[in-house]
Curated annotation (Swiss-Prot):
Listed name of the protein: Carbamoyl phosphate synthase small chain
Single Gene Ontology MF annotation: carbamoyl-phosphate synthase (glutamine-hydrolyzing) activity
Database matches in InterPro entries: Anth_synth/Amidotransfase (IPR050472), CarbamoylP_synth_ssu (IPR006274), CarbamoylP_synth_ssu_N (IPR002474), CarbP_synth_ssu_N_sf (IPR036480), Class_I_gatase-like (IPR029062), CPSase_GATase1 (IPR035686), GATASE (IPR017926)
Region (CPSase): 1-187
Residues at the active site: C264, H354, E356
Positions of the Glutamine amidotransferase type-1 domain: 188-380
Organism: Streptomyces avermitilis (strain ATCC 31267 / DSM 46492 / JCM 5070 / NBRC 14893 / NCIMB 12804 / NRRL 8165 / MA-4680)
Keyword Amino-acid biosynthesis: yes
PROSITE patterns (alphabetical): GATASE_TYPE_1
Highest taxon of source: Bacteria
Amino acid sequence: MTTSTRGAAKVPAVLVLEDGRTFRGRAYGAVGVTFGEAVFSTGMTGYQETLTDPSYHRQVVVMTAPHVGNTGVNDEDPESKRIWVSGYVVRDPARVPSNWRSRRSLDEELRHQGVVGISGIDTRALTRHLRESGAMRVGIFSGSALPDEGTMLAEVRQAPEMKGANLAAEVATKETYVVPAIGAKRFTVAAVDLGIKGMTPHRMAERGIEVHVLPATATAEDVYAVNPDGVFFSNGPGDPATADGPVAVMREVLARKTPLFGICFGNQILGRALGFGTYKLKYGHRGINQPVQDRTTGKVEVTAHNHGFAVDAPLDQVSDTPYGRAEVSHVCLNDNVVEGLQLLDQPAFSVQYHPEAAAGPHDAAYLFDRFVSLMEGQRA
């Protein structure tokens, strides 16, 4: 990715998909060229959390909401220390942000961090195209980086695909750090960082949990060195089929019957550890308004999603695994994709969506309490 941080408001830009479809607009954010997987997010709010979610590493995010940037950028809402998206696509960016917490405009923040974007294109048409044709490689070109369309298309087709990409270690912490419990400490949790969002350990800390966040390359010995009451596997980018290291660690956790909770990528890791396969969705689930049903209670939750892969597990039967019986606990009501797994003979469960609600609804916050209950039960 090559970028310039000079003003981009009137600089021409072109978005080129790997199937040859092009969209012309204006540069937004940094000027230059970038590549990634084109995906769309249906959230109308929460763009700052979306941009800083490590799960979006190497993806160009298309916002379906037409107006983006209205509330500017503040210093409180980022989910990590930097923007992770490879590129950003909006229809009509706010000219002047308005919010009491705003410190700068979204355009300024994108330029400051060197994120290439494009505005002024028909994002509705682009979203429909991705929905019908599937997520695909894309390039955004602006400024002096505007060669002829044939050259741009060739460059897009040379970019790496998301399938087969092993990305967790690229976004995870390199060193272990500790998020202290808020108030009295009740439990210790080892959290394997595969691309963890900042709000996730905070939600656990609110419940009296001291969270030791470990690198994606952590071994089972590293996990148990902190003497955990429970183990957590986070969200993250890339293809779960490549994550053999975390799968091996999770199998050791399951063998020891330590309380276990996984979110997003962690759900896919649990699926693999139990012997299920994973597969790439046509265009994925991304946004903060996805309906999921808890198959145990029948309750429907509106949830936040960001995943392009899913677990291939039977929906209507209990499966025998090396670690006991397992079943699908949650499904997406839009397409019946597996959104949660639970073991029936030991304290382990996971969900494909994001109960930490950053951004998004708080319907699934109870899952952190369920994790606490599993650790309480193990102590009893």
